[in-house]
From Swiss-Prot:
<dbReference type="GO" id="GO:0019064">
    <property type="term" value="P:fusion of virus membrane with host plasma membrane"/>
</dbReference>
<dbReference type="Pfam" id="PF00980">
    <property type="entry name" value="Rota_Capsid_VP6"/>
</dbReference>
<keyword id="KW-1154">Intermediate capsid protein</keyword>
<dbReference type="GO" id="GO:0005198">
    <property type="term" value="F:structural molecule activity"/>
</dbReference>
<dbReference type="GO" id="GO:0046789">
    <property type="term" value="F:host cell surface receptor binding"/>
</dbReference>
<comment type="subunit">
    <text>Homotrimer. Interacts with the inner capsid protein VP2. Interacts with the outer capsid glycoprotein VP7.</text>
</comment>
<comment type="function">
    <text>Intermediate capsid protein that self assembles to form an icosahedral capsid with a T=13 symmetry, which consists of 230 trimers of VP6, with channels at each of its five-fold vertices. This capsid constitutes the middle concentric layer of the viral mature particle. The innermost VP2 capsid and the intermediate VP6 capsid remain intact following cell entry to protect the dsRNA from degradation and to prevent unfavorable antiviral responses in the host cell during all the replication cycle of the virus.</text>
</comment>
<dbReference type="InterPro" id="IPR001385">
    <property type="entry name" value="Rotavirus_A/C_VP6"/>
</dbReference>
<protein>
    <recommendedName>
        <fullName>Intermediate capsid protein VP6</fullName>
    </recommendedName>
</protein>
<keyword id="KW-0167">Capsid protein</keyword>
<keyword id="KW-0946">Virion</keyword>
<dbReference type="InterPro" id="IPR008980">
    <property type="entry name" value="Capsid_hemagglutn"/>
</dbReference>
<comment type="similarity">
    <text>Belongs to the rotavirus VP6 family.</text>
</comment>
<dbReference type="GO" id="GO:0019031">
    <property type="term" value="C:viral envelope"/>
</dbReference>
<dbReference type="GO" id="GO:0039626">
    <property type="term" value="C:viral intermediate capsid"/>
</dbReference>
<dbReference type="InterPro" id="IPR008935">
    <property type="entry name" value="Virus_capsid_a-hlx_vir"/>
</dbReference>
Length: 395
């Protein structure tokens, strides 16, 4: 991995710096680095492709070295360099594509394709430049079974769920009480509802509880908690729990109420939040949201008509809130909405018509991976996302 990353980083730097008019001394370091890379690769033959629709190709390295000049780089120098850049870029993309369509149920983080396995041999160890990136550090740590640290913005932590829990419902669903929940990506939306607006609840306060669990613990969490739940706040026709009929979820947002969010790690209470806004939590792998809906002591006639004593009830009083994970660190590799690596992997596997593997579902769906995130999947995903980041450097 280190070698492939070094080649890609060198090619990327060469592409950016070698332009007409540039003073040679400004690019001398990357030129010398490229020449050292070429000397090491020349005389070797690599093979890529052969899986799905990927064509088989042989890469015979016989590249000329880049020259030196005392002057600014002219068009001839840039054009000759461009040929080397194009060859190396095509080689890197082919190796990455070949690696992306391979997976292994054991040692999935190690190279799987013949070309990358060959590059990992001792004869190429001198190609080891610019390996200070966090991706390489994490891969090296994970391959040694140490504890890497991954930093994410808007991490895709929550499985997609869009459902409800009923605590009370008459046969006609004219009087219902329960909790709707919607989770996806980095967001958890909750809507506690009651047609009677806690009319018969003790102390005019109705309690609702939602328990959630993450597939992997997260730490150093920055999150936003706000009123409202935009994805579940509209009138919606929902199936009943037995799927025999349908009923109308018709929410009216209620501000009277309180909430508590408890964060746990390995069953131990870590933190508790009772306020809206930006909050931080040290670490957690599960959470409990408790909502107390409070019936107002006084209501206007219009509000009383919406929630008449004894019914009929055409609306549900609804206390809603949204929890969004903004930043977090983990010891597990995840899909990140601010990164394109996961989509690069998915697109290459689809475009290559990759046969079904032993680790991931066909189509590489993140939701399915997250719902049953195994060690084998995590190991393979570590490798695949690193390879995708390498490919992105030369795209």
């Amino acid at each position: 991995m280190d070698v492939l990353f070094s080649i890609a980083k060198t090619v990327s730097d060469l592409k950016k710096k070698v332009v007409v008019g540039t003073i040679y001394t400004n690019v001398e370091d990357v030129v010398q680095q490229t020449n050292e890379l070429i000397r090491t690769l020349n005389g070797n033959i690599f093979h890529t492709g052969g899986i799905g629709t990927q064509p088989q190709k042989e890469w015979n390295f016989q590249l000329p070295q880049l020259g030196t000049t005392l002057l600014n780089l002219d068009d001839n120098y840039v054009q000759s360099t461009r040929g080397i850049i194009d060859f190396l870029s095509s080689f890197i993309e082919a190796v990455c594509d070949d690696e992306i369509v391979r997976e292994a149920s054991r040692n999935g983080m190690q190279p799987q394709s013949p070309a990358l396995i060959l590059l990992s041999s001792s004869k190429f160890k001198t190609i080891n430049f610019n390996n200070s990136s966090q991706s390489i550090k994490n891969w090296n740590a994970q391959s040694r079974r140490e504890n890497p640290v991954y930093e994410y913005k808007n991490p895709m932590l929550f499985e997609y769920k869009n459902s409800y829990i009923l605590q009370r419902a008459n046969p006609q669903f004219g009087s219902v009480m329960g909790l709707r929940y919607y989770t996806t990506s980095n967001t958890c939306q909750i809507a506690a509802f009651d047609s009677t607006l806690a009319e018969n609840a003790p102390n005019n306060t109705q309690r609702f509880v939602y328990n959630g669990r993450l597939k992997r613990p997260i730490s150093n969490v920055l999150m936003k908690i706000e009123a409202g739940a935009p994805n579940i706040s509209n009138p919606t026709i929902l199936p009943d729990p037995n799927n025999q009929t349908t009923w109308l979820f018709n929410p009216v947002q209620l501000m009277n109420g309180t909430f508590t969010i408890e964060f746990y790690n390995n069953g131990q209470l870590i933190d508790m939040v009772r306020n809206m806004g930006i909050v931080t939590v040290r670490t957690f792998d599960s959470y409990r949201i408790t909502i107390d809906m409070i019936r107002p002591a006084a209501m206007t006639q219009y509000v009383q008509r919406i929630f008449p004593q004894g019914g009929p009830y055409h609306f549900q009083a609804t206390y809603m809130l949204t929890l969004s994970i903004l930043d977090a660190t983990t010891e597990s590799v995840l899909c990140d909405s601010h990164s394109v690596e996961y989509s690069i992997v998915a697109n290459v596997r689809r475009d290559s018509a990759m046969p079904a593997g032993t680790v991931f579902q066909p189509g590489f769906p993140w939701e399915h991976t997250l719902s049953n995130y195994t060690v084998a999947q995590e190991d393979n995903l570590e490798r695949l996302l690193l390879i995708a980041s390498v490919k992105r450097m030369v795209m």
